């Protein structure tokens, strides 16, 4: 996937991304202060909002092969089980109950499968949102602070799970997080955004340990 010269203007904010490229089978991080444009560029990548101008080359990936998980879970007003089955139903993918059971175990909701999903705790809802995004084996997954409502143990578990999936599937991940420990552990490559632009990018270890701009230095100092 490659985006070129993307622009998006709101009343009090302007986004301009000259170039961002994503390779298959890698995990990317996007970091930066609140309001710098991280979520906006992610929504543009995911096809949820349209840029005012610019080019997006998905490299053969359709929007049905992409999914996005937000900090605030967006769940159906239905059972846990119905939420897991829904992505398969709308894509007309054959239901595999063994796989569904696997994901119920992953999010530790086996005994709550018939519970009304919005009544779950915030951490449980976040887990359900994340595994719901995985059930149809998407090629591109966007996580917008999707681990932020989980306890430390759950975060570590899902970090391990994401790294395990990366080794066995061609999925590309794009992760926004204010927890630099998440980015450092998970991401192969990281973009730093400031004021609507990508100001620094590179191998994650180099970006975090050898900041190339004053804004990045300040961000790392206070994060």
Identify the residue ranges that each predicted region occupies.
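Helix-to-loop junction immediately C-terminal to a conserved catalytic motif
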Residues: 46
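Conserved ABC ATPase "signature" region
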Residues: 97-112
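Conserved ABC ATPase signature
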Residues: 116-120
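Catalytic Walker B motif of ABC-type/P-loop ATPase nucleotide-binding domains
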Residues: 141-145
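H-loop/switch region of ABC-family ATPase nucleotide-binding domains
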Residues: 177-178
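C-terminal boundary and immediately downstream tail of ABC-type ATPase nucleotide-binding domains
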Residues: 205-223
């Amino acid at each position: 996937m490659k985006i070129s010269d993307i622009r998006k203007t709101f009343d009090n904010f302007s986004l301009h991304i000259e170039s961002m490229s994503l390779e298959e089978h890698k995990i990317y991080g996007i970091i930066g202060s609140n309001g710098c444009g991280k979520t906006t560029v992610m929504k543009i990548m995911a096809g949820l909002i349209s840029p005012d101008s610019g080019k997006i080359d998905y490299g053969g990936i359709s929007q049905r092969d992409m999914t996005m998980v937000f900090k605030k879970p967006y769940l159906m007003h239905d059972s846990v089980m119905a939420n897991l089955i829904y992505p398969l139903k709308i894509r007309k993918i054959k239901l595999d109950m063994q796989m569904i059971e696997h994901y119920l175990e992953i999010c530790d909701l086996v005994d709550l499968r018939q519970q009304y999903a919005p009544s779950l705790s915030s951490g449980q809802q976040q887990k359900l949102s994340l595994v719901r995004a995985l059930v149809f084996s998407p090629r591109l997954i966007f996580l917008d602070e999707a681990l932020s409502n989980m306890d430390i143990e759950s975060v570590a578990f899902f970090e391990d799970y994401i790294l395990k999936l990366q080794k066995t599937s061609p999925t590309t991940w794009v992760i926004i997080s204010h927890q630099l420990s998440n980015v450092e552990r998970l991401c192969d490559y990281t973009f730093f955004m400031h004021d609507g632009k990508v100001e620094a990018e590179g191998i994650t270890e180099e970006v975090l340990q050898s900041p190339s701009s004053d804004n990045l230095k300040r961000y790392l100092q206070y994060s």
